[in-house]
């Protein structure tokens, strides 16, 4: 049975630790994924620690003497221990076809998403502008009445008769008489005067009798038939 000194055992432990770190930090072919990281969750910290430890171990290992390096080469005879630990793991610069296709697909997806977003923003801006300057919408009830009244005015012209209001009056009238009264207060008491005016005459605040201007009002009516004959002008209490 072979025996080892303490220095050889320490060197063996150090070399095996370096090989284990090299195996851990070696990067194989990444798993082809779409939209996901190739590194499993929870492994990033372990890989970073292994790289740091590997870098710190390389510096003292490079200072060993040539004879110690020869002994370590003899001891490491297993196939998995032949992995070089002096150089960082090689990474391929060429992208596999699947990865290039994935990147092209991602670019197309981003472009399509951008176009969809722009079209959506255009639609929203058009809707907001139409809402601000949209056409005037007439109420349904008022629209029908307006159209009916307009059609009635166009097809049935208004009949101008004497029953319509004169320019100086605000209500319609018919040929005839209108009874008017004047009340006054004096020292002797209250005096009341009544008379008739044609319907076509204007209505004034002062007591006055007018003559017919339309030619259709009668000379007298049943109310003024018994009145004194009056020739027009201002009405006073003596008359």
From Swiss-Prot:
Molecular function (Gene Ontology), one example: metal ion binding
Compartment annotation: Host cytoplasm; Host nucleus
Q: Where is the composition biased (Basic and acidic residues)?
A: 65-74
> Gene encoding this polypeptide?
P/V
- Which residues are noted in the entry as Zn(2+) 2-binding? 200, 212, 214, 217
Summary of the function given for this chain in its UniProt record: Protects the virus against cell antiviral state by blocking host interferon signaling. Mechanistically, targets host phosphorylated STAT1 (phospho-STAT1) for degradation, thereby inhibiting the interferon alpha signaling pathway. Plays a role in the inhibition of host apoptosis. Interacts with and down-regulates the expression of host TXNL1. In turn, inhibits TXNL1-induced apoptosis through the BCL2-BAX-caspase 3 pathway. Inhibits host apoptosis also by negatively regulating host CacyBP/SIP. Promotes viral replication by activating the extracellular signal-regulated kinase (ERK) pathway.
Q: How does it assemble?
A: Interacts with host STAT1. Interacts with host TXNL1. Interacts (via C-terminus) with host CacyBP; this interaction inhibits host cell apoptosis.
User: What name does UniProt use for this protein?
Assistant: Non-structural protein V
Give the top-rank taxon of the lineage listed in the UniProt record for this protein. Answer: Viruses
Which keywords appear in this protein's UniProt record, sorted alphabetically? Host cytoplasm, Host nucleus, Host-virus interaction, Inhibition of host innate immune response by virus, Inhibition of host MDA5 by virus, Inhibition of host RLR pathway by virus, Interferon antiviral system evasion, Metal-binding, Viral immunoevasion, Zinc
Q: What is its main location?
A: host cell
**GO annotation terms (biological process):** symbiont-mediated suppression of host cytoplasmic pattern recognition receptor signaling pathway via inhibition of MDA-5 activity
Coiled-coil stretches are: none
Q: Which residues are listed for Zn(2+) 1 binding in this entry? A: 177, 196, 221, 224
Name one cellular component (GO) term: host cell nucleus
Pfam families named among the record's database cross-references: Soyouz_module, zf-Paramyx-P
Amino acid composition bias (Polar residues), ranges on this chain: 89-98, 143-153
State the residue spans of region: Disordered.
30-104, 126-180
Keyword Zinc (UniProt) = yes
């Amino acid at each position: 049975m072979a025996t080892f000194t303490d220095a050889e055992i320490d060197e063996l432990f150090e070399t095996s630790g370096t090989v284990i770190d090299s195996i851990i930090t070696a990067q194989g072919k990444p798993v082809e994924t779409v939209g996901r990281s190739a590194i499993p969750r929870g492994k990033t910290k372990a890989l970073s620690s292994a790289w740091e430890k590997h870098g710190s171990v390389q510096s003292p290992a490079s200072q060993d003497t040539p004879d110690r390096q020869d002994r370590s080469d003899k001891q490491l005879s297993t196939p998995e221990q032949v992995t070089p630990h002096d150089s960082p793991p090689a990474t391929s610069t060429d992208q596999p076809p699947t990865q290039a296709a994935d990147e092209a697909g991602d670019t197309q997806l981003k472009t399509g998403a951008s176009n969809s977003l722009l079209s959506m923003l255009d639609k929203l801006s058009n809707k907001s502008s139409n809402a601000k300057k949209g056409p005037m919408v007439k109420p349904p009830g008022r629209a029908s009445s307006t159209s009916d009244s307009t059609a009635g005015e166009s097809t049935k012209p208004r009949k101008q008769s004497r029953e319509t209001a004169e320019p100086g009056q605000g209500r319609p009238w018919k040929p005839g008489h209108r009874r008017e009264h004047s009340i006054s207060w004096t020292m002797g008491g209250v005096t009341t005067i009544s008379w008739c005016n044609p319907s076509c005459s204007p209505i004034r605040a002062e007591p006055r009798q007018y003559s017919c201007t339309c030619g259709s009002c009668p000379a007298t009516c049943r109310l003024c038939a018994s009145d004194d004959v009056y020739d027009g002008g201002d009405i006073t209490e003596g008359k």
